């Protein structure tokens, strides 16, 4: 891993450790929340027999949803030790320790024997990685032959406006996202076939609305002030409005992609 | 202190039957370990835990979303007296008319399969007389008016000495489609047989038993290596161009890895219009299982078969293989276009609302004019670029690459999963929606396929059903249908 991508991974991981992020985004960090995770799991053919890898698992919410609702065994990996500790604690509280385990790893260098998993997932994280192709190759080599991968992420069909390239845009994974066709090509190039892209833009509208409400609530209750933030988020309202317009214009959106290890 | 918790999520309660004595028992439906389970207990035979589905999301989709207003028979044939399933049929509490009506014309068969829900075989010599068959057909017409599908079955129906006369009797009545359920032996071996069948076109379809490509599997299910029979029967059916559905009985661990291959093979046969997969129903003859049929080990559910199809035929996406609204938790289907380049799925492109709300309740949707037109419209060129989803773009891309043939109804290919209900998984909520029915040989009753094999076939009615009815000491006063409910409401005001 290059120094830059190391910095980026740890920068993003640090960012996601902040309480403000959980306060803004809720338990499931990604758009669509647990509902989209279930959709992604179904689309990836996860069953009670499946051995699943969740790359960039965050606080392990998706791993728990998949273990509890699909009966699958899930290994989550993340770069943030703090998130992993939370994930383990939450799994223990939910009585899912037999079905979930959490491992510290970078998505670009997974510590698993090739062919260990039936399904590999990566939710809302692929476009954060410096080298998406490397991450996709890792998602592929972790799979048994014929195994499925499932991805959810932003797509960007036209360049994002400058206002979205700021830090908040970065947290929302918007800035560096490929186009829908870009994902298709990248998956194909990484050795996947039967690639299916499904647009789920409703997840973004829901998420933006939720963030807007939470910001208002946090400000109104004075739960948090600008001084509490170690990073300057700025005023979120214009950014969110820009983002909404941009999505409505077709410039960006959210998708889930599934594919088979060919 | 944290409250004690169940090891499962409670979903619903229902009524089932004990798989030993077939007595009605109280049951719960719960979610645990990603699966849907039925918990029930019989006062005499103890508790049972039965796998209903290994896909909670799909189970809920089928039960909660794919619901449509049920269609009824013209008039019920029995009264609601002992309670379901002891009043078949059709009793006034059944919630579905018969989409497919079976007439078993003989008990005789030219095979003796270790797995046979009907217990047929060469040793059984009884054929139904033409008079009796006419009475059974007239019952079908009396119940349905114009039955959508009559399936001539058995035993092996083609061994009936008056087989073609039976087909004539069907043709003389207002029947939509005539299906012949056969192992294909006579079609394969007898010169001119396929040609005589072809005289009943159009509207004739062959349901051809086709379980496997492997001799050891065919020996286990059919006691006979039928590979050459399959090949020759399909050659003959292709020559005379009779629409054919391959019907595969699926046994766990035996041929559940051949689903994709059977679909592929079907798409390469010009006469084949679809494949139907049926997990073995625990009823009738179940031989050849190590130390006997063991439901915990051997039962196979619809959701397991569905996922295996999706794994083995990756061209199909989960949204392409969906519940059939008339009996959603026990029937699933996919429609696809059969092109030279392979299968192009269609179901996922259709709004489920449309499938739920249009057409008669029938398991062969494409025969309904509205749905047929809708499918044909899918591959017409009037779709605007704006209205296209990614799936539609993919679909049109594939059509662009395979333009030479004229597309039409002939290109539609159907994949169906039919899970018949056994005593283990018996769920009153579901049994009332069954739509594949058997005309009783008495010509007076029409009985769901599922309960017929558990309680009404041959000697079962006397040996098993009668004692159960005697136990129900308080006769019910009538059905719980809407009409009666309305009447009592009126009388109370």
Residue spans of the language-model regions?
Chain A
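Conserved alpha-helix/loop element of class I SAM-dependent methyltransferases that forms part
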Residues: 30-48
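A short acidic, Gly/Pro-enriched loop at the edge of an enzyme's catalytic core
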Residues: 108-119
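A short glycine-rich, Lys/Arg-flanked "PGG" loop and its adjoining helix->strand segment in the class I
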Residues: 133-148
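Short alpha-helix
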Residues: 176-190
């Amino acid at each position: 891993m290059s120094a830059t991508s190391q910095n980026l991974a740890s920068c993003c991981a640090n960012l996601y450790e902040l309480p403000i992020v959980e306060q803004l985004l809720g338990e499931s960090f990604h758009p669509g929340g647990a509902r989209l995770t279930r959709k992604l799991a179904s689309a990836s053919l996860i069953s009670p027999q499946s051995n699943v890898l969740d790359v960039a698992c965050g606080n392990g919410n998706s791993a728990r949803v998949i273990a509890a609702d699909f009966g699958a065994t899930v290994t989550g990996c993340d770069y943030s030790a703090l998130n992993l500790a939370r994930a383990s604690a939450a799994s223990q509280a939910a009585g899912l320790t037999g079905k979930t385990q959490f491992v510290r790893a970078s998505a670009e260098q997974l510590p698993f024997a090739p062919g260990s998993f039936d399904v590999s997932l990566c939710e809302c994280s692929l476009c954060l990685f410096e080298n998406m192709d490397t991450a996709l190759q890792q998602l592929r080599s972790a799979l048994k032959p014929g195994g499925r991968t499932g991805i959810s992420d932003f797509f960007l069909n036209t360049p994002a406006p400058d206002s979205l390239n700021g830090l908040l845009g970065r947290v929302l994974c918007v800035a560096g996202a490929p186009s829908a066709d870009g994902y298709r090509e990248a998956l194909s190039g990484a050795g996947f076939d039967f690639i299916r892209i499904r647009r789920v833009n409703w997840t973004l509208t829901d998420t933006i609305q939720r963030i807007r409400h939470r910001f208002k609530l946090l400000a109104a209750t004075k739960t948090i002030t600008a001084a509490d933030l170690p990073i300057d988020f700025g005023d979120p309202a214009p950014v969110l409005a820009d983002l909404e317009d941009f999505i409505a214009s077709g410039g960006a959106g959210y998708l889930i992609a599934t594919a088979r290890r060919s | 202190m944290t409250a004690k918790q169940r090891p499962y999520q409670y979903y619903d309660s229902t009524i089932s039957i004990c798989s030993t004595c077939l007595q009605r028992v109280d049951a719960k439906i719960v979610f645990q370990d990603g699966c849907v389970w039925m918990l029930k207990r019989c006062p005499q035979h103890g508790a049972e835990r039965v796998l209903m589905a290994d896909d909670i999301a799909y189970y809920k989709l089928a039960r909660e979303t794919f619901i449509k207003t049920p269609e009824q028979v013209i008039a019920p044939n029995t009264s609601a007296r002992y309670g379901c399933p002891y009043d078949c049929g059709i009793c006034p509490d059944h919630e579905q008319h018969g989409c497919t009506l079976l007439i078993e014309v003989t008990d005789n068969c030219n095979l003796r399969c270790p797995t046979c829900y009907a217990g047929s075989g060469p040793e059984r010599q009884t054929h139904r007389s033409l008079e009796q068959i006419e009475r059974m057909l007239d019952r079908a017409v009396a119940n349905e008016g114009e039955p959508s599908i009559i399936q001539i079955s058995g035993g092996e129906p083609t061994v009936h000495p008056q087989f073609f006369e039976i087909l004539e009797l069907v043709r003389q009545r207002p029947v939509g489609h005539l299906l012949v359920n056969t192992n294909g032996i006579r079609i394969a071996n007898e010169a001119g047989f396929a040609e005589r069948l072809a005289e009943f076109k159009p509207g004739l379809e062959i349901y051809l038993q086709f379980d496997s490509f492997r001799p050891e599997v065919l020996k286990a299910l059919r006691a006979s290596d039928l590979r050459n029979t399959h090949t020759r029967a399909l050659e003959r059916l292709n020559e005379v161009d009779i629409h054919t559905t391959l019907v595969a009985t699926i046994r766990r661990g035996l041929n559940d890895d051949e689903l994709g291959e059977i679909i592929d093979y079907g798409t390469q046969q010009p006469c084949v219009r679809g494949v139907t997969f049926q997990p073995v129903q625990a009823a009738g003859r179940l031989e050849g299982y190590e130390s006997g049929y063991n439901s915990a080990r051997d039962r196979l559910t619809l959701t397991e078969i569905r996922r295996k199809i999706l794994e083995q035929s990756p061209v199909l996406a989960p949204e392409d293989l969906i519940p059939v609204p008339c009996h959603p938790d026990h029937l699933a289907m996919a429609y696809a276009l059969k092109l030279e380049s392979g299968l192009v799925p269609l179901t996922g492109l259709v709004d489920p609302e449309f499938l739920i709300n249009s057409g008669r309740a029938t398991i062969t949707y494409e025969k309904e004019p509205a749905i047929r037109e809708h499918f044909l419209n899918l591959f017409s060129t009037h779709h605007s670029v704006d209205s296209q989803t990614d799936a539609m773009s993919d679909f049109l891309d594939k059509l662009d690459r395979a333009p030479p043939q004229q597309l039409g109804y002939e290109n539609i290919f159907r994949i169906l999963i039919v899970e018949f209900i056994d005593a283990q998984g018996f769920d009153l909520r579901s049994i009332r929606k069954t739509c594949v029915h058997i005309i009783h040989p008495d010509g007076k009753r029409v009985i769901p396929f599922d309960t017929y094999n558990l309680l009404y076939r041959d000697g079962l009615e006397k040996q098993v059903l009668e004692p159960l009815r005697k136990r129900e000491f308080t006769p019910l006063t009538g059905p719980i249908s809407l009409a009666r409910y309305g009447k009592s409401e009126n009388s109370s005001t």
